Every structure is written in C-alpha cells, then in structure tokens.
A protein has these predicted regions:
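Short, strongly patterned local motifs
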Residues: 1-18, 25-26, 33, 37-39, ...
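Sec-dependent N-terminal signal peptides
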Residues: 67-73
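Short, positively charged and aromatic/hydrophobic N-terminal segments
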Residues: 21, 46-53, 57
Length: 505
C-alpha cells in the first residue's frame, strides 16, 4: 500500500512521513494526483488546519508573547472523547520522551495533538501519530511540552533551568455541555489524571502560554514539526527565531520498533491474513469489488481490530492497473485478475498486505507469467533484506534495484519491450503507527525495523495489474516475513480458490 497523508497536530505541520495527503514513494517527491483517502487511518480528514483559524487577537498578543501566543491559539478549541494511555505502555512512552529529549538537548520541544472536528460523525477522532507515539494519549486538544534532560550543574543558566518542569502534558478542561454529546473525557482537574496519563505534571491547556513563556527564558531554541500550509505558515513563522524541525529526530526513534510494537504489527497482520482468506473464499464472478472489501472489513472488526489501516483498494480487470484505485464499484467477471490491497489496524498499529488472485479460480497463461515475474522479484528482494540495505532507488545497496533488475530481465510486453517500465512505484516503506510510518527512505535498514516489500507490474493494454506485498521484519541475519501465512504461490492460490463460495446477489 503506497500512500500516506495526514496533517500533523504539531501546528498541522507535515513531515517526510506525513506528506499532507500526497502519495510518497521511497525516494520521490509527493504526487498529489495519486493521493487517496485514509478513511480508517490517521488522516487530514480527522483534523482541521489550525492555520486557517488564527483569530485577529493573535496579532495583539504577539508583541508580548510572540511564539507562545501563536502556538497557544491553535489548540484552544480541542475537545471530544478519547481514552487513557495504555497502562502497560506508560513506561515505554516515557522512555521514548526521554530518548527524544536526549537527542534534542539544546532546546524545548512542543508538539500538538489533533483536534476533533465539531459535528463530524463520519470518522471520529484519531490522534496524531507522533503525539501518540510519545504520549499514548488518545483525546483531542492536548499539548506536549518537553525540556532537555538535566545538564551540567556548572553550565551557565543551570539554576533557572533546574526549576522548570521537564515534561508537561496540557489538556483542555472538561466541558459538561459538550460531554452531553460526546461522552465523558478526562480533564486536568480529574484526581487520577496523573495515573491515567503517566505524566507527573498535567496542566490545563490555558496555561500553556505562560509555561512556554517561562521556558523560553531558559532555552533559546524550540523544536516542533515545522512545515505548515498556506499563508498561516508565514504569519506564524515570520516573527519567530530559533525554530528547528523535530521530525527527523522523532522519525529516527519510530523507525526502530520495540518488541511490543512488533507484536502489535504481527497481530494486525494475522487478522489481515484472515480477512484475505475470507475474501478469497467469497471472490467469484458476479460479485462487486465493494463486497470483497466489506468481507475483509467485517473480519477485521470481528477479530477485535478497530479499523482498516487505509481505504481498501480492490481492483478487478482494468481497475487492477491503477495503483490507488479505491472506488471499488465494479462488477467482477471471470478470467480477470483481482488485486486486493487491504489491511487492518489493531491497537493503533497497521499492517499492509496485497495479493492478486484470478477471478473464477484459474490464472490465464499470460496472467500467470506476469504473476510469477512479480513473485520472483519479491523473492529476490526479500532474500536481499538485511541490515545495511536501503529502500532508496538510487543507493548502491538498494532493495528496489534488486526487484527492478529481476522484472526488467524477465518477460516482455506485447510489443517485445522489457517489463521494467511497468514497475512504476517504489519497493516499499516502513510500517507502524502509520501504514507509511515515519522514516528516512535513504537510511540503511537496521534490525528491528518493519518494512513492506511490494513489487508490481501494471500493463493497461492487457488489463493486468499484479502486486504482491508482504510485511517484513529486518533481523540481524536477514528478514522474517510476518505475513508468510498467506500463500503467494499461484498454484496454492488456485487450490484455495477451488473452494470459493458461489456469488451472492
């Protein structure tokens, strides 16, 4: 699944892993024309751009408060319902914050959670993933303020810095009238707020302005996520100084997965495989693509996964050649291929699996030829996965090149040309809290990283699109395929499809 897009809650700034509803293949610039909705994932559909909501009072406050006024006003209207940080993960969230504070040791860090769209009953609220990664907090309107780890007591300004809180979580105060609609949420005034958040210092969001001002007396630099949209970005950044981007530091932490994170990704993957198996059993001529998508989504929910990791991509026949086809509205016919790029999200962590099967139970000779080339490319790339390799297209140690070279040296199109030109996207991406998780595609792989390996060939002239995608854990010795339980061999696929249920109309 090669798409990503959501606005971050950190001033609605976007990072490399959060490209504002633009597809981002490894090593390439965003491509808005390929952007797709992330219904069911953390997306811009779930938050408003704070930059479009700056009131006129901002200009009056700037002379006194500067950055504090600018940032504070962006989150005052946060409200809604969420849930507390997972108790068994609180220590891990704290360890992540400590690691970030150690990395960004010359300034304070300010991050904002998402805010809830008033009256939005279609999607609900989903937390900004960087904020969730560091806090585990699931309610809207929160702010995180971090100071560096304690420094040398002999360093200049130590006395002033030592008096400041090191970690503050700001929460909106409860609104009883709003809670009549949204349900009860947790406010800074609640007696157990420290226990449920895992923070020693929790304050009302209204105090963020003052606390930030106090910290600015001791630290000159502020880290946040610094890419904001449109004119509001200029209004905010013009009067500010010493603003640095925290995106790369956070992405570096998120790229390496803990054992708990790997277990959650494995859980999402196992459920995803169950969904694919159910879809295979149902797929038959006469059904509609959306019925296949619904079958998988039902399995995800019944298995305890809260949502799809992204909008299902279920393309049959001519629709199989479109990378991010999501209309899912066509009636399937016998003799076509059906490409299903669908996955679950469980406990906040995504999987990302694609399989291509024949509608009617048997590949044609040409479909099987193309399928086996893609499978060979994927096998070659997975065999090459090890620490030190990259997902970048241009690096000498590129996994993409392994897959591309295989495709380009096997088979031809109807005009006798090589097939490499039909492999039109990157090989893969990192997976985690986001289906396209925060990462640096040029960085060498390390043990503990989780990536996808997903070569594909898409030939519009033949109405054949084939992609095979698996989730892979990088180990010290090579790779462990977390999705190995779902067949890829065309013979095994055909055997399983032989028991497919008849079409239901």
């Amino acid at each position: 699944m090669q798409l990503l897009g959501y606005e971050t809650g950190a001033l609605a700034f976007s990072t490399q892993a959060e490209s504002g509803e633009h597809e981002r293949w490894a090593d390439e610039e965003p491509k808005p024309e390929h952007s797709k909705s992330l219904t069911g994932a953390r997306g811009s559909a779930y938050s408003r751009d704070p930059g479009s909501m700056i009131p006129a009072i901002l200009e009056k406050m700037r002379p006194r408060w500067g950055l504090a006024a600018s940032l504070f006003l962006l989150v005052l209207d946060g409200s809604g319902v969420g849930r507390a940080a997972e108790p068994n993960m609180i220590g891990q969230y704290r360890a992540r914050r400590i690691a970030l504070r150690k990395s960004l040791d010359d300034g304070i860090t300010v991050l904002f959670g998402h805010r809830e769209e008033d009256g939005d009953l279609r999607t609900g609220f989903f937390q900004e993933s960087n904020f969730y990664y560091l806090t585990g907090w699931q309610e809207p309107g929160a702010i995180l303020l971090l100071a560096p780890l304690p420094d040398d007591s002999h360093a200049p300004g130590y006395a002033a810095r030592a008096k400041l809180p090191r970690e503050i979580l700001f929460l909106p105060e409860r609104n009883p009238e709003r809670e009549k609609w949204t349900g009860r949420k947790i406010g800074p005034e609640d007696d157990n707020v420290g226990k449920v958040t895992g923070f020693e210092t929790v304050m009302p969001a209204e105090k963020f302005e003052t606390e930030l001002h106090d910290m600015l007396q001791a630290y000159a630099r502020i880290y946040t996520l610094t890419e904001q949209s449109a004119a509001a970005r200029l209004k905010l950044l013009e009067p500010l100084r010493e603003i640095s981007n925290a995106a790369s530091a956070i992405a570096k932490l998120r790229m390496s997965k803990s054992s708990e994170e790997i277990a959650l990704i494995q859980r999402a993957t196992d459920v995803t495989l169950d969904g694919h198996r159910a879809a295979w059993q149902r797929a038959a001529p006469g059904l509609y693509e959306y019925q296949i998508a619904a079958t998988m989504t039902e399995i995800f929910a019944e298995s305890g996964c809260e949502r799809n990791a992204y909008s299902p991509i279920v393309g049959s026949g001519p629709n199989s050649v479109y990378l991010h086809y999501s209309r899912n509205s066509r009636r399937m016919d016998a003799g076509e291929v059906l490409l299903m790029d669908v996955a679950a999200e469980c406990s906040g962590y995504a999987s990302d699996i694609t399989r291509t099967i024949p509608v009617g139970g048997k590949f044609t000779a040409r479909q099987k030829e193309i399928y086996e080339i893609v499978l060979g490319a994927q096998n070659a790339a997975i065999a090459a996965v090890k620490p030190g390799m990259t997902l970048s297209k241009s690096a000498p140690n590129s996994l993409y090149k392994v897959a591309y070279d295989y495709i380009n040296s096997h088979g031809k199109d109807l005009h006798g040309e090589r097939l490499g030109k039909y492999f039109t996207h990157g090989l893969g991406h990192h997976v985690g809290l986001d289906v396209h998780d925060a990462s640096d595609p040029s960085a060498p792989l390390e043990a503990g990283m989780v990536i996808t390996v997903e070569p594909g060939i898409y030939i519009p002239e033949e109405n054949i699109g084939v992609r095979i995608e698996d989730v892979v854990l990088v180990t010290g010795q090579g790779a462990k395929v977390l999705s190995a339980g779902l067949p890829r061999d065309p013979g095994e696929i055909e055997k399983l499809l032989g028991t497919a249920a008849p079409a239901r109309h």
